[in-house]
Amino acid sequence: MPSSEHSFISVPHDALRSVRSFLAFFSKSFNRDQVLLSAGSLAFQTLLSIVPLMAVILSVLSVSPVFDSFKQYVEEFIFQNFLPASGVEVQEYLWQFISKTSSVPTIGGLSLFIIALFLISTIDHTLNRIWGVDAPRKFFQGFTLYWTVLTLGPIFIGSSLVATSYVWYNFFTQGALADVQAKTLLLLPVMNTFLAFFLLYILVPNRKVKFVHAFSGAILATLLFEFSKRWFAFYVSHVATFEHIYGALSVIPLLFFWIYLIWVVALSGAEFVYCLGVVHPERAVVREFHPLLGISAVLLVIERISAAQSSGGFLTMNTLEDLCRSVTRMQLRRITDFLLQQNIIHKTEEGSFALSADLHTLTLYDLYAILPADLVQPKDPETSDSHFGQDLSGLEQNIIQCLQHAMHQPLAAFLNTATRTL
């Protein structure tokens, strides 16, 4: 009976602890990757590239006479799904700009295509940086991918509209199925938004992303996106600050602000998907006390970086993961963040890791004394009662003195000895 009661209580406790751990890691990852700053950078580049990008998409559709009649539907598809209800004025301005691109000469048209490629490349690099993929794609691989997106993407949308229209008007326009058509049309923008986020999260990262993680992230991003659309429409309708300040030019800051919100939502969803892949629920198991728990993983990371630097090279996060397979990706990020914060290592201009501290003067105890709580044995809150304060304080001093004596050796000497025994 006591055991069943204990299991009944521990399950919610473990679930709550896992949620707290996930939210804490998500918050750190969100701030470390500078999501808000990256969203602003992408919003600015998108604002400059949106007209060239739309011009390229419509020009690709104009190549085939089959899709030429669907250009209007593609326009409506994009604006109905990715602009709030108050975006009619924005739509009119954009189509005025896009219509003028048809008279651009060949060299100008090529520059529009290059600008659109740069936008897709920036999106690719920003998302992959969240997954810790610092090394860019090879030129030919990246160019082929971006070219495929720009050319086959519009054709895919056009083909989908052709097929959907055929099924719609042949099977869903009569009888009881007409009600199904009406209800489905209401959900279609949400479904399209979900599909766009899902494909973004599962295809763009140069890492294997689980289907369920991308699916969950797309659901979260879609909910945030729909909330943002309604909030933005309310803001524009009731708080007309931009119109009072900018007048007729208010469409530009409004469009920029809306694009910024889109990228905040998209990158937040990407961070959520990444965290789902690296954070695993912790099980409450009884472990033997190990006073040096956690320091071995930190020493392994330092040793790998030191060995590479001694050979004249530096390690990226990807290479470090391959060399430290016994360390989880989440723990490795925590360790590198800790070492960077303590100036034991630093990042080169290329984003690789290099040593900053002198391992001949930094001792094991120096390292152990500054290890954060999430890298060592967690304390049991039930044993922190002040009633045992004096006894525990004396015991702690004895342990510290023993550790100082036993660990008073430079890291370089310890790592050299450990390497020779391997």
Swiss-Prot record:
PANTHER family: INNER MEMBRANE PROTEIN YHJD, UPF0761 MEMBRANE PROTEIN YIHY. It is found in: Cell inner membrane. It comes from the Bacteria. InterPro entries: UPF0761_bac (IPR023679), Virul_fac_BrkB (IPR017039). NCBIfam families: yihY_not_rbn (TIGR00765). It is a multi-pass membrane protein. It comes from Prosthecochloris aestuarii (strain DSM 271 / SK 413). This is UPF0761 membrane protein Paes_1471. Pfam families: Virul_fac_BrkB. One of its GO terms (cellular component) is plasma membrane. The chain crosses the membrane at residues 47-67, 103-123, 143-163, 185-205, 208-228, 247-267. Keywords: Cell inner membrane, Cell membrane, Membrane, Transmembrane, Transmembrane helix. Belongs to the UPF0761 family.
